[in-house]
């Protein structure tokens, strides 16, 4: 096996690993509000989302073409560069998942690839007009638009249902949430699975397996990316789901349906035009809008502020990881460089996963009350069962003998004659 084929295999495996992390990182985009409001049981929600993500991945390839051709010069791409960009995306996805921050997988991937490209060939390798017009501008506009649509939709829902019994409206909206959440999952598969298709497409162009003039990825690329994302989605990104469903706003069924409907509309529209949109930012904007639009709702602006900071630093920090990885792999070179880069990625992923086990979040505690941060109040539940022993009861007080009277202070007692 020659070095280039070896690198291609590593790139394909790493790309599918990124797709897997994208699946569990972004499950909350579709299902967080349905889980938080009780419309769907947690495990049922992620299973439904996995199936619809799988179907959605086959519906379009416009975004894949954007990733493959619209952001960097395909003629300057090497397999080392693509691998380094994927490492940047995976590491950022895992870090934000650990912290429960719903940041953009799309921007992590794009940032990693752009950073690796700059490290490899300089600024000339990046199509800056494409980055601005296809990534940055749509992200800002879509997040603001989703917030506005979510707020207006929520306000209209509560305005329309004034005077109707709350129990009746919530039951109806819970049913509606199943449909709207399904639509968001379908939209997520349509938009996000294509990004990994585009990366593998780019690697195949670099290797020479497909023409640089090709416009559609091979069928095996589409199928493998769809399956990887569906598998990741089925595991459920419980940490992200908790932040979106409980940390930002206390979601009620009418808010959940309004948020999901606005998310689906914006995501599907962007996928149709080939924009590499962040579904996370759209979903978060919609949830935030649902809090703003409901009279008297509480929005946790501190949590929202941390999310915005994460969004702002995603592109540059993922780019730094991508650039560092490219420099390391390229400096060592050959098989040792590729193997070392791959090994460091998996060691980093393992360390992050082990850290998350200190306070695990899953379907059993994802809806626990929010007590200030992601894991507050959950640490006790993370202890092994052997450590959760019930308290030992105090021994009972001794029973006094018959005819015994306890002495009273200040009273002199005499023995009977």
From Swiss-Prot:
GO terms for biological process: phosphate ion transmembrane transport. It comes from the Bacteria. It is a multi-pass membrane protein. Residues 379-417 are annotated as: Disordered. The chain crosses the membrane at residues 5-25, 44-64, 81-101, 108-128, 135-155, 218-238, 301-321, 327-347. One of its GO terms (molecular function) is symporter activity. One of its GO terms (cellular component) is plasma membrane. It is found in: Cell membrane. Residues 390-404 have a biased composition (Pro residues). It catalyses: phosphate(in) + H(+)(in) = phosphate(out) + H(+)(out). Keywords: Cell membrane, Membrane, Phosphate transport, Symport, Transmembrane, Transmembrane helix, Transport. Pfam families: PHO4 (PF01384). PANTHER family: LOW-AFFINITY INORGANIC PHOSPHATE TRANSPORTER-RELATED (PTHR11101:SF54), PHOSPHATE TRANSPORTER (PTHR11101). Belongs to the inorganic phosphate transporter (PiT) (TC 2.A.20) family. Pit subfamily. Low-affinity inorganic phosphate transporter. This is Probable low-affinity inorganic phosphate transporter. The lineage of its organism: Bacteria, Bacillati, Actinomycetota, Actinomycetes, Mycobacteriales.
